[in-house]
């Protein structure tokens, strides 16, 4: 696994983590989003369909897992297809790019966890079909990933807002703005000042 010095460095340099450890080549917009996770508590990304945002989300999960002790990373999306077939598969793909990482991070159909720490060092996939999808998570380091956020009901966001009252919690939302109201829409409109916002095309 990474040395203590490397962990301290990469915790503040997610772009370099993605390049050095995952052997990926983020485009300029993806780099800005990754850096926003260090510099801002809440990041919201408007994007079209495509793998570009799924890659950023997957990189973010793996980066946070490897550079923060005992994190919890709840991930959600409106449908099982978006969550498991796309995002979760993307996480599996990128972690395999580093043999050491691949052996230390254990991937299952619904969970990614640090070897030997399944209950306290993990990312977990929960579909946004029930109000309690994102409830019950407590840790010093939290990263919420909400994919296709425009299709996620506002009540799902309520526990996220509660968690974001603590300094170690962060939020990354991505989605195609298909709704003209709601939590995600507001993050690019009336609540825009509270967020670091981006607009990218869906592309590889």
What are the roles of these predicted feature ranges?
Residues 1-204:
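Phosphate/NTP-binding elements of NTP-utilizing enzymes
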């Amino acid at each position: 696994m990474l040395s203590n010095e490397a962990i301290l460095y990469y915790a503040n340099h997610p772009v370099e983590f993605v390049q050095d450890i995952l052997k990926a080549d983020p485009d300029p917009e993806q780099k800005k989003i990754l850096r926003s996770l260090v510099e801002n508590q809440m990041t919201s990304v408007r994007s079209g369909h495509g793998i570009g945002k799924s890659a950023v989300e997957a990189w973010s999960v793996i980066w946070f897992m490897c550079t923060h002790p005992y994190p919890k990373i709840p991930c959600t999306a409106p449908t099982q297809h978006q969550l498991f077939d796309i995002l979760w598969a993307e996480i599996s793909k990128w972690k395999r790019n580093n043999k050491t990482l691949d052996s230390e991070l254990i991937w299952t159909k619904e969970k990614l966890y640090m070897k030997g720490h399944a209950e306290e060092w993990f990312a977990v996939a929960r579909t946004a079909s029930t109000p309690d999808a994102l409830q019950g998570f407590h840790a010093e380091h939290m990263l919420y990933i909400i994919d296709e956020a425009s299709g996620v009901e506002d009540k799902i966001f309520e526990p996220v807002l509660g968690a974001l009252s603590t300094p170690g919690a962060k939020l990354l939302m991505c989605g195609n703005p298909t709704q003209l109201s709601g939590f995600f829409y507001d993050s690019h409109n009336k609540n825009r000042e509270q967020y670091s916002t981006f607009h990218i095309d869906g592309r590889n």
